[in-house]
């Protein structure tokens, strides 16, 4: 009888212990993480252009197969009046994604008018014990990554040497007087990133980390070393990185080279009018630019791909980590190439984004409490137009205004892409809503199919229980 009671007691204790271990394992297995992937300037036109080129008109991209798809309305306000502004830049839109607040163009995680610092999801996640990382194909001091971990009144205050009377491309771009350390501010973007609690930063922008504005002042790269970052300047150096190291990877002086370019580095061109057509629009001829091929960019060969950087980031952030992580990955030059009217460049960078999405979804498949969101900050200039006008039978030359690029596709067709938002050397952003894609968690957690852009922050913060 005593033996039976002892057996029952032992069995009960064993079951309780097993239940406790199971609960612990379940808790460990349910570690929440968020991977936010941003295609800068990626809208439905850019996605369709890339799909037509990469997969064919009947093909699909990985984005098309994600369980959730919705749209976000972009919000911007005027710096002085606070009235709505209907076309954004990357600074205020990244601020919306990073902080859930609406601000004016050019601001990095600071409020319009009052210039208050706005807490970012990176800072909130750090405060809750999550590891955090930023990966980009631009300079890591550029507007999108900066908005997740820095606070300045102007996106152009990227280094200690660029805080007062900033001039870029021959244009005066203002100052960040109140952000100067001498005035009690946090310093430039590069200094703030160097002193941040981020676990990982990968991208370009080396020049902003070695610049200073006075003899004896520490550079941002010195501050980063003092803050425990292992600094690498070449992808070959990753073999020296321990999985638990804090990493600052600076793989270019400014932005990383793009994957594809037009042959002979061609961009969109202006249709050529005959002399007679210049005299009278109803007569003569207008000749469209000759079609181009997209080719591999030789400058890209030694550059880490966005896929490689994304894999490394996830490895570093997840290593021996039961607390989860927040990772922002940006394909930056969809936008930059569109500004330059270079569709092949934008196509290649959207292809890079898709590769990064593949890496994120693969990780989420093995770690099912990982939320993966893919979105854009704003829309852009490129649009698909008829290669042969619908009105070509009219007895006059009919052609697209602005500049046009005609790209040979793998199907043997010609994809005509128009840029006509500006008479300046660079194209403008546009003001439509942006797409947002998600994995199954976006569905199960009931992310709305229509939302305001700041709501993306709220959804991520709620999922990570940061509020």
What are these regions (language model features)?
Residues 32-54, 113-129, 139:
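Active-site-adjacent structural elements in enzyme catalytic domains
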Residues 79-113, 119, 123, 134-137, ...:
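Noncatalytic scaffold domains of N-terminal-nucleophile
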Residues 1-9:
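N-terminal secretory signal peptides that target proteins for export/translocation
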Residues 26-30:
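Boundary at the C-terminal end of the N-terminal hydrophobic targeting segment
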């Amino acid at each position: 009888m005593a033996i039976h009671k002892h057996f029952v007691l032992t069995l009960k204790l064993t079951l309780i212990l097993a239940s406790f271990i199971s609960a612990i394992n379940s808790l460990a297995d349910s570690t929440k993480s968020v991977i936010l992937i941003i295609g800068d300037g990626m809208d439905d036109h850019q996605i369709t252009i890339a799909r037509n080129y990469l997969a064919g008109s009947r093909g699909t991209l990985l984005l098309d197969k994600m369980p959730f798809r919705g749209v976000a309305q972009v919000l911007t306000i005027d710096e002085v009046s606070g009235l709505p502004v209907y076309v954004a830049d990357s600074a205020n839109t990244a601020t919306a994604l990073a902080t859930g607040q609406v601000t004016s163009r050019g601001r990095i995680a600071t409020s319009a008018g009052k210039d208050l610092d706005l807490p970012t999801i990176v800072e909130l996640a750090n405060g809750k014990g999550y590891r955090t990382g930023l990966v980009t194909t631009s300079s890591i001091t550029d507007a999108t990554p900066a908005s997740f971990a820095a606070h300045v009144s102007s996106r152009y205050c990227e280094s200690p040497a660029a805080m007062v009377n900033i001039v870029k491309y021959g244009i005066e771009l203002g100052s960040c007087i109140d952000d100067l350390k001498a005035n009690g501010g946090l310093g430039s973007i590069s200094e703030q990133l160097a002193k941040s609690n981020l676990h990982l930063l990968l991208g370009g922008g080396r020049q902003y980390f070695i610049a200073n504005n006075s003899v004896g002042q520490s550079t941002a790269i010195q501050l980063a070393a003092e803050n425990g970052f292992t600094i690498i300047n070449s992808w070959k150096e990753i073999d020296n990185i321990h999985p638990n190291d804090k990493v600052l990877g600076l793989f270019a002086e400014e932005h990383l080279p793009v994957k594809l370019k037009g042959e002979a580095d061609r961009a969109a061109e202006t249709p050529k009018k005959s002399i007679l057509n210049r005299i009278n629009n109803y007569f003569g001829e207008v000749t469209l630019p000759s079609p181009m091929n997209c080719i591999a960019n030789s400058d890209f060969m030694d550059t880490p791909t966005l896929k490689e950087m994304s894999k490394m980031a996830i490895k570093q952030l997840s290593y021996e980590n039961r607390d989860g992580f927040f990772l922002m990955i940006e394909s930056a030059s969809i936008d930059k190439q569109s500004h330059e009217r270079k569709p092949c460049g934008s196509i290649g960078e959207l292809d890079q984004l898709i590769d990064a999405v593949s890496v994120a979804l693969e990780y989420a498949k093995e770690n099912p409490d990982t939320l993966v969101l893919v979105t854009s900050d704003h829309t852009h200039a490129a649009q698909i137009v008829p290669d042969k006008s619908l009105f070509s039978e009219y007895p006059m030359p009919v052609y697209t205004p602005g500049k046009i690029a005609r790209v040979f596709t793998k199907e043997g067709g010609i994809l005509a892409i128009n840029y006509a938002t500006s008479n300046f050397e660079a194209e403008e952003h546009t003001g439509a809503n942006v797409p947002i894609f998600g994995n199954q968690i976006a569905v199960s957690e009931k992310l709305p199919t229509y939302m305001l852009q700041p709501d993306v922050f709220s959804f991520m913060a709620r999922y990570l229980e940061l509020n």
